[in-house]
Amino acid sequence: MISLGAVAINKKGDNFGDFEINLAPMENSVSDPVTMDWFNSEAPDALNYCTKNQIPPKEAMNQFGDWLLKLPSPRIMAAHPAPIDFAWVNYYFLEFLHDRLDKYPFHEPFFQVMPAFDIKSYAARVLQKDYADINRNNYPIELHNNKNHTHKAIDDAREYASLLVKLLNI
């Protein structure tokens, strides 16, 4: 993970803050060539953006943890698709914040509900579609215009936060 973006919202769409940070690669890590080829061809601006101003992962995750603790409760991670994003964030929490997690079951106080809320699954239910048929390119335009999907973590977080608020209020 080289970039992390998060938006704190409630059902009404009130924004409690945004968080964005670029992480330096983990020690002894190796980039996945398929992922890098995809970013270089599909989202080179996002790749260029997230490789600037990188900070060590432990420092980045501590900053993220500090930001989370300032937010009102309950804090529930939501993502699209959650199984992928949650896996990365959870791994980095365990790897770099284990000293802050030992005394808290299920990663509290960072998130009160684990694992993450899957926006894609919720959208499938609300829109009465099969999960496999749900993606950012086929949402009704009134829910999601897809023009802000830059693959920069913060832009995508804002985009999916907006989608979630709309879905929660259908």
Explain the meaning of each model-derived region:
Residues D37-E42, Q128-N137:
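A structural motif
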Residues Y91-F96, R125-K129, L163-I170:
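Active-site catalytic microenvironments for nucleophilic, acid-base chemistry
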Residues I76-M77, A87-W88, N135-I170:
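Acidic, Mg2+-coordinating catalytic module of metal-dependent nucleases/exonucleases
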Residues M1-A82:
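Conserved non-catalytic scaffold segment of RNase H-like nuclease domains
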Residues Y104-A132:
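Short, flexible loop segments at boundaries between secondary-structure elements
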Residues P83-M114:
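Substrate-recognition/cap helix-loop segment adjacent to the acidic, metal-dependent catalytic center
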Residues P56, H80-P81, F110-P115, H149-D155:
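Short, well-structured alpha-helical patches and their helix-loop capping segments
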Residues P57-F64, D85-Y92, P115-I119:
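Amphipathic alpha-helical interface surfaces
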